Amino acid sequence: MAIYSERETWSTAQMHDHQLEGLKRTVRHAYQNIPFYHETFKNIHITPGDIQSLEDLQRLPFTKKHHLRENYPFKMLACPMDEVVRIHASSGTSGKPTVVAYTKNDIQNWADIVARSITLAGGQKGDILHNAYGYGLFTGGLGLHAGSERLGCATVPISGGNTANQITLIQDFKPRIICSTPSYLLNIGEAMMMQGIDPASTSLQYAILGAEPWSEEMRFQIEKLFHLKATDIYGLSEVMGPGIAMECAECQNGLHIADDHFIAEIINPDTLDQVDEGQYGELVFTSLTKEALPIIRYRTGDIASITREKCLCGRTTTRMSRVKGRIDDMLIIRGVNVFPSEIERYICNLEELVPHYQIHLQKKGHLDHVTLHVEVKQEFYKKLEMNFNHPMAVKLVESLGKTLKMKTLISVDIQLKEPHSIPRSEGKAKRVLDARTKIIPKTSIH
C-alpha cells in the first residue's frame, strides 16, 4: 500500500531530532506570545532555554480544556488576528465553547496530515470520497474535506443528515471511500436495507470512521454489512482536528500518529506519571508545528495505549491503540468502572441483536441501577411473533445478562426493543442517559 510521506518511515533518531527542534520552537512561541503559558512557566521557574531534550517535556505543566475555556475566546492565540484564516469551536454543553484557530500554514499542514490519513485508509488520487461528517464549527467535515482535496480525491461534501439523499448519491456517484461516524454508517446501511438495497452491493471499499469510541465487534458488523475495510481516524479540535492519528487499512493494528507534528504521551490520570509502553492511560499531546494555537501537554481525556514498534505496513511512526473510552464517559456503577464500548462488544456478538442501544442509569434507593435498551433484528422479532415474553427472548435476555455480569461485574436490567425504535444519530450517537445526578432538594434540620 502507498506511503504518503517519507517522514512516516524515518528512523527513530531522525524523528527525535525533528521533534526536539519542533518542541523548542513551540515552547518559545507559546512563552513569548501567550500570557497563559508565559505565566505558567514563570511560576515553575522554567524558560524556553531550559528545554534541551525530549525528556525535558515532562518538566512542563499540563494544559486542560478548562484552561482554554477560561481564556475564551482568543486569549490563547499566539499570533495576531490578521494571520488567522479560520476559527473552529467545540460544543459548549458544559460551559463556553472551546475555540481553536488556524493560520494559513496551519490549514496547509492539517490538509497534508489528513491526506496522509486518507492514504493510510486505502485512498488515492482519483477516488471519489463521500464525506458524511458534519460541516461547520465541528472540525470533522472540513478537516476531511481539505485532506481529500489535497490528496486529489473527488470530494462529495454532503455533510451529515438527510440519509435518503446520502443513499441516492452513494448509488449514483459510486464513491470508493466514505467518511462518517460508525453509528451513522450503520444507520445508512440499515436505511439501505429498508429500501431493498444490499449495502454490500455498493461501490464503497473503504470507510474512515471516528468521532466516537467504537468496538472491534462493531467494526466486524460494519465490514460484514458493507463488504469494505473500516478504519479508525483520531483527532480532537484542541490539538488540530481529525488526522492526528490514523489506522492503516493494511494491518488495522493501531493508529499511526503524525509524529512529525505531535508528541504523544500516556499518563496515569491519577498520579500524572508516564506509564510504560503498552499500558493504558490518558492520552496527552503536544503540537510541534501549530502557529495560531500551539498546545503543550494537552490532556485529552481519552484512554489509550501506545507502541513504538515498527508496523508491518512499513511505517515507523508511533501507534496508539483505538480509544477505549473517555475518562468522563467512564461509568462508575456501584464502584465498578465500565466503558460503554465494553457493553457494546457483547451486544455485537449476538446475532439476534443490532448495535443500536442506550444505557439508562438511575438511582433506586441509594443504589445505582442500570437498564440496557437494545434493539433486536427484524427477522428475530418476527420469530418472537412480536412478543418479548417469548421463550427465545427470555433466553436471550438471561444469556446477555449473565455475560455482562461475568465480564463487567455489574448487574444490568435488559430490555429488548423492537426494530427501529431507538433514536438514530446523524453524528455522534447518544449512548448513555444518566438520571442519577438530579438535584435533590435540601431539607431543613430542626
Residue ranges of model-derived segments:
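Active-site glycine-centered loops adjacent to acidic/histidine catalytic or metal-binding residues
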Residues: A211, G235, G335
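Generic structural signal for residues in well-ordered beta-strands
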Residues: T155, A230, A264, Y357-I359, ...
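Conserved beta-strand termini and adjacent loop/short-helix elements that scaffold enzyme active sites
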Residues: I158, I233-G235, I267, Q362, ...
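AMP-binding/adenylate-forming catalytic core of the ANL superfamily
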Residues: I178, T289-I410, G427
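Short, well-ordered beta-strand segments
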Residues: I128-N131, V284, H373
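Active-site phosphate/ATP/adenylate-binding loop shared across adenylate-forming ligases
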Residues: M1-E6, T63-T231, G243-G254, Q362, ...
